[in-house]
Amino acid sequence: MRLWFCLSFLIILCVEHFPGTLAVERNVPESEEKTEQFLRDLFEISRLQRRPAGFTPFRGKFHSQSLRGLSETKRIYNAIWPCKHCNKCKPGLLCKK
């Protein structure tokens, strides 16, 4: 009986120390901890990579055209309406204030 107990104890001890199914099944808390750490790291990465307001990831021909269109619209607006600050400046000129 003692021999059986010693052998079973040694077998369980060996299985625990070497990678195997029993060791994996008994390592549930460690794997949960790794999962939680992974989720915390993922949250931190996504928090650091947040984009500022108004940022567009779209680049290329159409993006530069839309920027060009904005400047043309601003020029047309300044040519038609007087200065916003004093309403006395001539259209198209920069305000001195």
Curated annotation (Swiss-Prot):
It comes from the Eukaryota. It is found in: Secreted. One of its GO terms (biological process) is positive regulation of smooth muscle contraction. One of its GO terms (cellular component) is extracellular region. Keywords: Amphibian defense peptide, Cleavage on pair of basic residues, G-protein coupled receptor impairing toxin, Repeat, Secreted, Signal, Toxin, Vasoactive, Vasodilator. GO terms for molecular function: hormone activity; toxin activity. Residues 1-23 form the signal peptide. The keyword Signal applies. Expressed by the skin glands. The keyword Secreted applies. InterPro entries: Bradykinin. It holds the Pfam family Bradykinin. [Ala3,Thr6]bradykinin: produces in vitro relaxation of rat arterial smooth muscle and constriction of intestinal smooth muscle. Possesses insulin-releasing activity. May target bradykinin receptors (BDKRB). Belongs to the bradykinin-related peptide family. This is Kininogen-1. It comes from Bombina variegata (Yellow-bellied toad).
